[in-house]
Amino acid sequence: MLKKTKIICTQGPATDPDGIVDALIESGMNCARFNFSHGTHAEHLVRISKVREAAERAGKVISLILDTKGPEMRLGEFAEGKVQLEKGKQFTLTYDDAPGDETHVSVNHKQLYSEVKPGDTLLLSDGLVGLVVDEIRGKDIVTTIQNSGPMSTRKRVAAPGIELSLPAISEQDERDIIFGIQNDMDFVAASFIQRPSDVEEIRHLIAKHGGHMEIIPKIENLAGVNNFDEILAVSDGIMVARGDLGVEVPAEDVPVIQKEIIRKCNAVGKPVIVATQMLESMTTNPRPTRAEVSDVGNAIFDGADAIMLSGETASGDYPVEAVKMMSTIALRMEESLEYDSIIRARSIRERSSVTDAVSHATVQLAYETSAAAILTPTQSGYTTRVVSKYRPKATIVAYAPNPMVARHINLRWGVYSILGRKWTGVEDMIESCTRGALSHGYVKQGDKVVMVAGMTYNEGGSVAIRVTTIH
């Protein structure tokens, strides 16, 4: 049984040694993530080339994800670089950019004074130190320190429950996205998205520069949660970024939010990624905790298309072992899924198109005939995406002549992309797709398969289903 849940591996110093990326692909990596909060364009380009070369050697499609730094709110400079903040003392966030000390420091978001009020909580350095706002004095924010802790230059500031007037993308984000377009990357994981207009702004930037990257907003603050339905409607997928989300909303709310986001993404057939601290202990240990195994397993049971490794592969001591463990967990969970129940549950929902209805029928047919695979030759990826929505037990083999389409649908649950030549007719399409599935080992002689494809020749735009045995 082939793994259906996609694994995203963050690239970094731990993946740089020769052979590591090859081992990640062999162990189950489907997508490579590049975190543009760190590193230079030159460093990322070297890693992009390394992934592409390894994918070529493996004969597999590997998608590339550009994760933006985002419009973060951060502290300014401390004169000494770092200070010790003491519980109960006053600490002022200043409009002025002069170097700070243990009594004050600047903040880069200059409108913050107009967006907070007395009683609001601000969190520094991912929640390490809490501040409560006492008063707004001109454009300065006077606070009381809630707990002692060290603090240093440029640490992040979070404002839980407050919608901030931050831009959708920073100047750095714009430069990074243009770099991604120029280097044919596939997805933008857009940090700190608060509203649908943020997504539209990024889409406009991509179109302006002739790009085709799909946009995956990261839901990591209360505004993103509150505006989720509208954000989902204009997005190509969603990432549940649990690390920052757990700072911005109460930690006990994160599992509830995660499940609801997955449910809504599944309902409309858009891919959803669950990220952050999934196998965190494997950064330094060769084996995960039992809680981490359960966390990964539950994300898969809930319906995640993809699960992501961050520091585990970027800077950890056991990057390959982490991917192997994630693959093992995914396979075990997928063996336990009640595919017939999933098909029945999703058949209740209103289907919006002929392709939607035919895709559901295809999955039902594949289940009832015990087909080994569903073959989806595709020009645009549309049929493949809709088939994936219904979570078939059979492997989805997508034969695509367009490299960009092959990489985009590769993020989808259960889809194995094959990049092939453009076909010349219906029979050539069927033959090419079947040969490709055989040569890649996704099917074998004697396997029963279901083929579904949108026809664009003389069939008037129809969708056809064919059941056949591989010979």
Question: Where in the sequence are the language-model features?
Answer:
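Non-catalytic helical/linker scaffolds that mediate oligomerization, partner binding
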Residues: 1-471
